[in-house]
């Protein structure tokens, strides 16, 4: 296998840590004095400076110094964790403990090894996009002989120089780790196999150098091309060196004396190598003088990151060995290593990966549905589709029933208008109907549902039909107009005058006179385009639609005829413009002179196209239609303001209505997972002013529609995008994550602390920014939090700097039109019932 490194090597010093253990029981019993003290996190001090013959420095500084009470977890987290985790990124690394006997080397390395391997496994579990392989091996050097700790035969192994891997141990056992329990089992085997013995200084003294190696290899799980098919391979070594000792202190003899000689000789060679490396590689460095230095050669100034933990005893009896350890540490911190990322990009590895991919594809081609699980999945999918089809058929049948019912009710309503015409000078002809003329049943395909004073009816195939309060009568009754006028009762006249707002007695006389003048030309009422510009045309005073009867239409969506002729002779200064209605099918009539489906005055019609599903109304298109309706209603209201009656509504009740609607919108925002930026703009722009009624109503109906769609498991179409409850929740999560990144950019440190305090976030907690954005707009019932949330989001998105540009976000102009700016405060609530 061909191994290459990244062209740029990272050059760094060896990390040197010093750990000073407390006095043990034997030293305390012997009344030993502690001559060493850690004065800060980087410096250790020798306190007995008055001792004779002391020519050593009294203070030593290193990367990190740990007192006796510091746990092994802190030593790992602060010092060696970063180096140990380099192995999963393709960088070789080594961690070893150096020190005198009974100073705590084995105790320290046991904890470091377990913590590091646990973090390596956590990293592997969190990065499932790559395939990892972890191999475990362990050896010991006992009396200059290499033994395999995973083998019980005790055979001595040989060292071999490999051109690719460097110095390797022949026939060393490598176990592929399965899980954490497997690792614990192997570590217990190594502990049992290692040579230990009892001396006067330590009851369990390590008599050999132990080296545990983890080799981590990772590659992408999917083939992403030759350039991306790289494999990373690196090793991490955990080395527990035997402690240096004096024979006079250890009182060793025989086997223990021989072991101590080999240990001291290998440690002396290691110290010589470290001292020469600290001087900049001047002269020959003989790594081959000891098997220990030969194995550690890559770790000492080579392709690896290295950390050395020097363990010390504070006892006065060990002061000379402690100073020797500190001198070794001072030389080690000057040694430089050049670690590289080991990337395997050989043609063999690429060929092997391509062969595996080819074999997998061939297997899928041979057995596309051979497994029982695949057949079961296919059968399950077919059953699900059948159930969906049956459900949709039932829904279609129900929608057709609702369409037929709505059409029949519409026909009955038109007949009622035709047969209940009453006449009086100055009063228009219209049917005896109430504000709510149908029982509230609305087609499920309707885009907006409103059961209060206005209703939307859909035939299931055409666009939703909006019936405004209009004053209509049949043109077939024009000839009998003079006969009907005298016979109309006064009671009925008064009732109709109460229903039609702002009709005065003077206007009634004027309308009656105009009606008498135009009665001689009833054909103008039926004209669709001939007299559109004439001064005597009735269409110039009343903007209405001429419809044909349902029996003569060309499509199922054509409405009945005889609806659109308004009352005649209204004065020019008080013209009323009604919103035009357009249907999905072309309206035709065999006996008509020209197309009667167009507006007689050329007024633009409100088009409400269907969504992609055919049954979902586009909210944006509907809002554009409401904008046009609002303009025309403004003209009506402007005319009414010039001397007409208004119902007096108390300001307190209007304020309560606004607060109720706003609270309902806040709760629907939370239910439908609406964007936080959308909530902020809407909350800050609409304060209950006179022109806000339109947008409050539109937003409320939009949210009700989305809530109903989500509760039934359906999709909602908004802005050309299909929304579901899951997708809206996902978009809201993405938006919160984006806002969390802006917190550090928009607010200073003091501002962030103040905001965290407002939202109850602890200053010393983690991921405070993410906690903050998760708290924004989280409680719609707490108006204080709502205002604070709007303020924070507005500052994050710089709402004040964007000005009027952001007032187009709903497809409407948020600035009130000129005809609304002169009206009384709170008058928007009065005009709401007449807008839809």
Curated annotation (Swiss-Prot):
> Which keywords does this chain's UniProt record carry?
ATP-binding, Coiled coil, Isopeptide bond, Microtubule, Motor protein, Nucleotide-binding, Ubl conjugation
Kinesin motor domain mapped to chain residues: 13-335
Q: Where is the composition biased (Polar residues)?
A: 588-607
Name any GO cellular component annotation: plasmodesma
Q: Does Glycosyltransferase show up as a keyword for this record? A: no
Molecular functions per Gene Ontology: ATP binding; microtubule binding; microtubule motor activity; mRNA binding
GO BP of this protein: microtubule-based movement
Q: Where is this region: Disordered?
A: 422-460, 588-611
| Coiled-coil segments | 344-420
Query: Residues that bind ATP, according to the entry?
Result: 99-106
Matches recorded under SUPFAM superfamilies: P-loop containing nucleoside triphosphate hydrolases (SSF52540)
Statement: the UniProt record of this protein carries the keyword Coiled coil:
yes
Residue(s) of cross-link: Glycyl lysine isopeptide (Lys-Gly) (interchain with G-Cter in ubiquitin): 707
Kindly name one Pfam family recorded for this protein: Kinesin
Classify the source by domain of life: Eukaryota
InterPro entries from the UniProt entry: Kinesin-like_fam (IPR027640), Kinesin_motor_CS (IPR019821), Kinesin_motor_dom (IPR001752), Kinesin_motor_dom_sf (IPR036961), NACK_C (IPR021881), P-loop_NTPase (IPR027417)
Task: Tell me which PANTHER family the record gives.
Answer: CENTROMERE PROTEIN E (PTHR47968), KINESIN-LIKE PROTEIN KIN-7F (PTHR47968:SF18)
| Protein family per UniProt | Belongs to the TRAFAC class myosin-kinesin ATPase superfamily. Kinesin family. KIN-7 subfamily.
Q: Protein name, please?
A: Kinesin-like protein KIN-7F
């Amino acid at each position: 296998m061909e191994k290459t490194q990244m062209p740029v090597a990272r050059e760094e010093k060896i990390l040197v840590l010093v750990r000073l253990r407390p006095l043990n029981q034997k030293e305390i019993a012997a009344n030993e004095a502690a001559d060493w003290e850690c004065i800060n996190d980087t410096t250790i001090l020798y306190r007995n400076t008055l001792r004779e013959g002391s020519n050593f420095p009294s203070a030593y500084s290193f990367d990190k110094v740990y007192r006796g009470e510091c746990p092994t977890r802190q030593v790992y987290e602060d010092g060696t964790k970063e180096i140990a985790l380099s192995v999963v990124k393709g960088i070789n690394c080594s961690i070893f403990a150096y020190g005198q006997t009974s100073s705590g080397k084995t105790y320290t390395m046991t904890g470091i090894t377990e913590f590091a391997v646990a973090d390596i496994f956590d990293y592997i579990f969190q990065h499932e996009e790559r395939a990892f392989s972890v191999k475990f091996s362990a050896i010991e050097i006992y009396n200059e002989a290499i033994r395999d700790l995973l083998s019980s035969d005790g055979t001595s192994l040989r060292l071999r120089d490999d051109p690719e891997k460097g110095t390797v141990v022949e026939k060393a056992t490598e176990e592929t780790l399965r899980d954490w329990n497997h690792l614990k089992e192997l570590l217990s085997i190594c502990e049992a196999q290692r040579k230990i013995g009892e001396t006067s200084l330590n009851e369990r003294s390590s008599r050999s150098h132990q080296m545990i190696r983890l080799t981590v290899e990772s590659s992408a799980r999917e083939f992403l091309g030759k350039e991306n098919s790289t494999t990373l391979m690196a090793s991490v070594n955990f080395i527990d060196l035997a402690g240096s000792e004096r024979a006079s202190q250890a009182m060793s003899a025989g086997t223990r004396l021989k072991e101590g000689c080999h240990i001291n000789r290998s440690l002396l060679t290691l110290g010589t190598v470290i001292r020469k490396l600290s001087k900049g590689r001047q002269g020959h460095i003989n790594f081959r003088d000891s098997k220990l230095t030969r194995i550690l050669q890559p770790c000492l100034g080579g392709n690896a990151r290295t950390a050395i933990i020097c363990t010390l005893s504070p006892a006065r009896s060990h002061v000379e060995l402690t100073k020797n350890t500190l001198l070794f540490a001072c030389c080690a911190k000057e040694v430089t290593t050049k670690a590289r990322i080991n990337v395997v990009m050989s043609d063999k590895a690429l060929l092997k990966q391509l062969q595996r991919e080819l074999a997998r594809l061939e297997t899928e081609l041979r057995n596309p549905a051979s497994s029982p699980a695949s057949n079961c999945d296919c059968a399950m999918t077919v059953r699900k589709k059948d159930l969906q089809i049956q459900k949709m058929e039932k829904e279609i049948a129900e929608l057709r029933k609702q369409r037929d019912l709505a059409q029949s009710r519409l026909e009955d309503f038109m007949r009622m208008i035709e047969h209940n015409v009453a006449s009086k000078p100055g009063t228009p002809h219209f049917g005896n109907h109430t504000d709510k003329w149908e029982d509230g049943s609305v087609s499920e395909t309707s885009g907006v549902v409103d059961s209060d004073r206005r209703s939307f009816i859909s035939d299931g195939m055409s666009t939703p039909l909006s019936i405004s309060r209009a004053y209509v009568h049949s043109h077939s009754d024009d000839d009998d107009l003079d006969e009907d006028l005298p016979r109309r009762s006064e009671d009925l006249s008064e009732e109709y005058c109460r229903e039609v707002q702002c009709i005065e007695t003077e206007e009634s006389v004027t309308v009656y006179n105009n009606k008498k003048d135009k009665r001689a030309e009833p054909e103008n009422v039926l004209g669709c385009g001939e007299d559109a510009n004439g001064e005597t045309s009735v269409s110039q005073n009343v903007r209405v639609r001429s419809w044909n009867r349902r029996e003569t239409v060309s499509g199922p969506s054509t409405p009945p005829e005889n609806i659109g002729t308004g009352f005649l002779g209204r004065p020019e200064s008080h013209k009323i413009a009604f919103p035009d209605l357009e249907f999905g099918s072309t309206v035709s009539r065999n006996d008509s002179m020209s197309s009667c489906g167009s507006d007689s005055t050329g007024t633009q019609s409100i088009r409400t196209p269907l969504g992609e599903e055919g049954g979902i109304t586009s909210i944006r298109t509907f809002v554009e239609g409401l904008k046009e309706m609002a303009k025309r209603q403004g003209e009506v209201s402007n005319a009414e303001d010039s001397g007409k009656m208004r119902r007096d509504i108390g300001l307190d009740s209007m304020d309560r209505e606004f607060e109720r609607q706003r609270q309902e919108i806040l709760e629907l925002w939370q239910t439908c997972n609406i964007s936080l930026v959308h909530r902020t703009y809407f909350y800050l722009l609409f304060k209950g002013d006179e022109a806000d009624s339109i947008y409050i109503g539109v937003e409320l109906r939009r949210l009700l529609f989305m809530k109903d769609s989500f509760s039934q498991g359906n999709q909602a179409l908004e802005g050309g995008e299909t929304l579901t409850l899951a997708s809206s929740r996902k978009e809201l999560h993405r938006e919160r994550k984006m806002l969390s990144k802006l917190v550090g950019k928009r607010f200073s440190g003091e501002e962030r602390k103040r905001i965290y305090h407002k939202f109850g976030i602890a200053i010393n907690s983690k991921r405070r920014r993410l906690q903050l954005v998760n708290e924004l707009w989280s409680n719609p019932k707490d108006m204080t939090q709502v205002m604070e949330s709007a303020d924070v989001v507005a500052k994050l998105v710089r709402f004040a700097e964007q000005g009027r540009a952001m007032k187009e976000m709903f497809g409407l102009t948020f600035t009130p039109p000129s005809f609304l700016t002169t009206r009384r405060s709170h008058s928007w609530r009065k005009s709401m019932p007449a807008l839809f």
